Amino acid sequence: MLMSMGFVVAAFYRFVHLHNYYDMRSVILEFCQEHGIKGTVILAEQGINATISGERDAINKFFSFLDLDHRLADMKYHESYSSRLPFSKMKVRLKKEVVRLGIDDFDCSSMRGEYVDPKAWNDLITKPGMHVIDTRNDYEIKFGRFKHSINPGTTSFREFPDWARKWAEGKDKDVGVAMYCTGGIRCEKSTAFLKSLGFENVYHLKGGILNYLQSVKGADSLWEGDCFVFDERVAVDNNIAPSEDIKCVKCFGKVDEADLRSVSKGHIVCGACKSADVS
């Protein structure tokens, strides 16, 4: 079973006002270091966004630790598993935004699109005339996507607003738009931005691709390929297990675990090809 793989990977976010987020950094970092937890936590005045990994007991204790702060209590998170820690360090970063859209003072709290449960997602995206937009970056989409979804071709989420403005030109604002991303946080902002352009029927996949893969299995799934993740697993399969189908972009051969620890934006190169490039 996947749960016997040894390490739990937990991804979560919450938009909530954290006026003291600067002070929270050292407290969270110290707790994680004491419990052998590694990963990345982003703190901003507008909330928290994180993916962490550790042994089961350590992860349970971490969320009990978050419960001590009423703003972060009862945190919902997506869980997957790995045979090794998929992070080499524990980082707690302070940012202006928990996910960078590139528009100063853009408030998504009152405009975000309508959440759609994974069980209802298939019916939504197969409706005639529904526009399905993948809000992730191009290098993520290459690993997998929902069939017939629109790829904005971005290299950074900050490029999404410019793409959306151009895409929206001349379109009927009453059309249906369904949006998705890895864990849901980018869609909180991208759906709100699309609504700010005048679109009314805007939806997004609740909990993102990871939640969908947990909820919709086998022949019922409309997901094709793997799902890129921002850790040393690089991608997970339909069972949210580390993908065994990751190949070198140059020779298409197998890539060792050591080479997966230095992947930049999905550009995977095996050791042999790296050596050939240097020589």
Curated annotation (Swiss-Prot):
Q: Which UniProt keywords apply?
A: Oxidoreductase, tRNA processing
Active site feature? C181 (cysteine persulfide intermediate)
Write down the InterPro entries for this protein, in alphabetical order: Rhodanese-like_dom (IPR001763), Rhodanese-like_dom_sf (IPR036873), TrhO (IPR020936), TRHO_N (IPR040503)
Gene3D superfamilies annotated for this entry? 3.30.70.100, Rhodanese-like domain
PANTHER family in the record, alphabetically?
RHODANESE-LIKE DOMAIN-CONTAINING PROTEIN 7-RELATED, THIOSULFATE SULFURTRANSFERASE/RHODANESE-LIKE DOMAIN-CONTAINING PROTEIN 2
UniProt lists the family membership as follows: Belongs to the TrhO family.
NCBIfam families hit by this protein = PRK00142.1-4
The protein's job, in short, is:
Catalyzes oxygen-dependent 5-hydroxyuridine (ho5U) modification at position 34 in tRNAs.
The name on file for this protein is tRNA uridine(34) hydroxylase
